[in-house]
């Protein structure tokens, strides 16, 4: 078997080397970009070499003809932070523009710390006078989403201080001391919005710091928490779609961070396969474009979820979809003026960003039948307070609602 794959590798390398020599001719740069996701000739050459190595690997188990359920009528989704808008009119304006652009889903946080604020079972917000129901803002968000015909993927995460119970040194985003408390919070949200919120995502990126706190990540513990919350949500609303946490694409195995592929397999080994309807991945392009076909456990790109799909099929989950919970390219200013994290997520121009994201939707329809909703990260910040952070430059709108090229491109895209 080893001899067989060696022969294939050598033959592939020879063939692609010849192809590369032929392709580096006038008029072929765009074709190569479409095949490799790289715009520069050096990157294209490396991509061709990596493609040869990919051909030498055993084929992935993708079950492309499997019947997928649940399916979505439209994959167009976007991440929102409507709870950060103080004025209800601004929430309404966001949802109006979201619907006008053809989006049919929002992925919206329902932060635990902002709902069950002071103590277990206490949904009164006393942080400012006068005290009021902590549900008020979220009731408004759900009602507005219904008015504009937009489905909600509710992110359930971010514990209040009381839920850490002596574990606060792990960080504000870390898991609660008692997983049953998280399940109770998920149940409270599901009970209040039964039949109105269509999907719930149980946590986010538990395979990396800081989302699992300042401690070693633990797929087995996350599986326990997931299964507890899944059971509670389904008991209240059997028709709700439950998403597992989106796993961050990483090759790290340091302990505080763990490869998404290893984390997912350990989730399955711990019995989590029965505790979600949809797997979730992050669809960031990072350092290459939307057509990058390279696949390696030791590299990250827009197609990395394909490796997760292989693990799902191997564990008997060919019928479940993957939703891309966050997807985009980082359109940073050309000169770094003190922006923290500059270049950590790659760098593209606003024009490239506006071209790449529509191409991602097109590729998903063409190549990835198991991919459902794709949620662009993100729609709009409430203010420009984070302009010194690289993550700010994933936005589609400025804080004053000025649309950027990505918004206009997606609005114009046939759907």
Model region roles, listed by residue range:
Residues 1-14:
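N-terminal Sec-pathway targeting helices
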Residues 5, 17, 26-69, 122, ...:
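Aromatic-rich peripheral "rim/lid" segments of glycoside hydrolase catalytic domains that contact
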Residues 21-105, 120-122, 128, 143-144, ...:
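N-terminal carbohydrate-binding accessory modules
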Residues 74-80, 106-108, 152-156, 200-202, ...:
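Hydrophobic faces of well-ordered beta-strands that scaffold small-molecule active sites
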Residues 85-99, 179-191, 257-269, 354-363:
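Short, acidic/polar
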Residues 98, 106, 145, 189, ...:
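Conserved, mostly hydrophobic/aromatic
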Residues 101-124, 128-256, 286, 332-334, ...:
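Substrate-binding cleft and catalytic face of glycoside hydrolase catalytic domains
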Residues 179, 183, 217-347, 395-396, ...:
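Noncatalytic carbohydrate-binding groove/subsite architecture in carbohydrate-active enzymes
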